[in-house]
Amino acid sequence: MPIKNLLKASLAGAALLALSFTGASAAPSIPCGTAKLIVPWGAGGGTDVIFRQMVDKVNKNGAKPQLQVVNVGGQGGNKGAKQASKAKPDGCTLFAIHQSAITSYFTGRIDITWDAFETISMVTSTPSIIGANVNTPYNNISELVAAAKKAPGTITAGGTFGSTSQFVFLLLEDATGVKFKHVSYDGTKQRMTALLADNIKLGEINLAAAIKFIKAGKLKALGVTNDARLDQIPDIKTAQEQGANVIFAVERGVVAPKGTSAEIVKHYAKMFEGAAMDKDFKAAMHLSLIHISEPTRQDR
């Protein structure tokens, strides 16, 4: 199956997260004083940073139970996904998810699909940056494509195999006809470290993690995968402007184990919607180049 079709299938599942349940209801009985939100990557990555800020806002808003981020890294996010899918559906375990949960299924790395979870809410949408080490000779996607065509399969691109960070480069290959040499790293932090150290030439970087290095001149931004330039970094062209038809964003949301009651799902959806729509939280996310996805109510 072509890469574009695989990604479309994963995004179709991600779209379900937008159907959050937010009707008013009495607080359900949840048998824990603190519920855990499993983040399936290590501390310091984009998903971890986003959800720690969101959990902080949820807790300050008086969440019952209070939430605690628990990092379960390993296997490119699959270890945490497996643990979350097997958790008791009593409201004491939630899972921070994005498309990698499905792209890993398509590549045979995991047997879990969206059907293993109850959807609570879409939270953020984050376009990717095609990043390059500062010592590379190319300064934009057009120059990168030209270089890759001259030396197919030699330019190293870092990303977790089977995850969104690799799929960005597979989409770029599909759109331009080039081939990269893919190198796997287990998470954003490891990939960023390798990119800055010139161990790899390219890396998909989320905007929250990349902007400080770009502005400091420690990382090149060859292009963004948004459909329009970003106002925070307006000089960086989109991939489409440079002749590569690639539009992509990491869609992050919250789910619960399959079988979690509708009352508990509604309870958490309301909590996350309140945090996501908070003006201070939205401002903080905007500074990190992260778009807040407003939950879509079923009764609208």
Regions found by a protein language model. Name each.
Residues 99-109, 171-175, 201-236:
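A ligand-binding cleft/hinge motif common to bilobed small-molecule-binding domains
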Residues 27-116, 154, 161, 177-201, ...:
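N-terminal (or domain-start) structured segment
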Residues 150-154, 273-288:
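Periplasmic-binding protein-like
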